[in-house]
Amino acid sequence: NQNVKPLTSAQAAEITAQTMNSKCADCHKPGTHISELVNTLSGGLLARHIRDGQRSYNMEEPPTAVTLSKLEHVLQINSMPPTSYTMVHWGSTLTLREKNAMLQWIKDERLKIFGDMVGEEYALSPLAPIPDALPTDPAKVALGYKLFHDVRLSTDNTVSCASCHSLEKAGTDNLPTSTGVRSQKGGINAPTVFNAAFHAKQFWDGRAANLQEQAGGPPLNPVEMGYEHPDDWKKIAAKLDQDTAFAVEFKKVYPQGFTGETITNAIAEYEKTLITPNSPFDRYLKGDENAISENAKKGYKLFLKLGCQTCHTGPAMGGQSFEYADLKGDFFAGRAKTNDDNGLMNFSKKESD
């Protein structure tokens, strides 16, 4: 109906909140009461629905790029709420108005997450091209480059950031587990530093909120770079201060000199430049129809149809969520589990993670 006015962002958000609370909360909000009788009669289906629902989208947590893509996909294929739910909860099927409001709300929320990073033109889609560059301070980038390659950040002057994140090896060291000071082996492999700027969290267990927090981890790790306590940044600063020329150059940008805060800030600023724009697929997303083959275009349509974007979303096509490793098979067959295999739970301390 052409006379129907489009919803404002506020209206879409209000309708979405009402709809979720009335039609989605049973499975997507913690604390849902489970009737033991109904669960038994359903063969455990009720409990599984609630478990899987809260794994997919927890309504009490702020929406992320991944949860937005998941919501968008199930709305597009009309799979939520599932038939097994609507059959016993009359009136829970989404109306067209509710569905359209939720789709608009999803785009509005996605714009908040990626708008400044990739621009409004691309932020509304589940996938976005990697931007040509991120805003950075060139002077800080230059200092960060030097620190990224500086072995003096380690106790025995043998390990730098680049030791485990070699730019000649796709931002990694190509080893099952990385080698730290005194030839010690870490418990997990080094993730690539390329496009890490787009990740929602840093480290495999998400314990760092951003690049700067991540940069502060390895120097204070007894296995990786050898230091252990926050006060040890003073020892690192003392070593760097012995390099008079570098210290003078550094103070021109950071008047307070070498500290844990300034060192990690410079490294993070440099890491923002380690992005990979203008791949053929990036160019295709920007509108160049000739950038990829017809077969690749078919593959992208299949990618969207099957819901691959519900995990592989954003400009880096991933790095936005923590997924359950038990969904498709036993990833730990043939070896003993280690503490690192706990993933997010090591940081969150939640058994559900």
Segments from the language model and where they lie:
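Post-cleavage N-terminal segment of exported redox proteins
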Residues: 1-11, 78, 91-142, 217, ...
